[in-house]
């Protein structure tokens, strides 16, 4: 995941934006940090989904076919 310092900076810039004191340089920095955060989030979420197996109450594997295919293509 993204470093805590970067997440803190995203939050700090967000507060400045709400207050109306965000400079154009900070706006560029905010956009860059947000894109980096979203990329990191998506990568981790994809990994979580690929490693999840869904079992129904009868014990049958009901993991969606698309997830199984992602898993196969990964290895």
Swiss-Prot record:
Pfam families registered for this protein in UniProt: DUF896
Q: Which domain of life is it from?
A: Bacteria
Q: Which UniProt keywords apply?
A: Cytoplasm
**Ranges annotated as biased composition (Basic residues):** 65-75
The record, for InterPro entries, names: DUF896
PANTHER family per record: UPF0291 PROTEIN CBO2609/CLC_2481, UPF0291 PROTEIN YNZC
Q: Which HAMAP family match?
A: UPF0291 (MF_01103)
Q: What is this protein called?
A: UPF0291 protein lmo1304
- What is the organism field in this record? Listeria monocytogenes serovar 1/2a (strain ATCC BAA-679 / EGD-e)
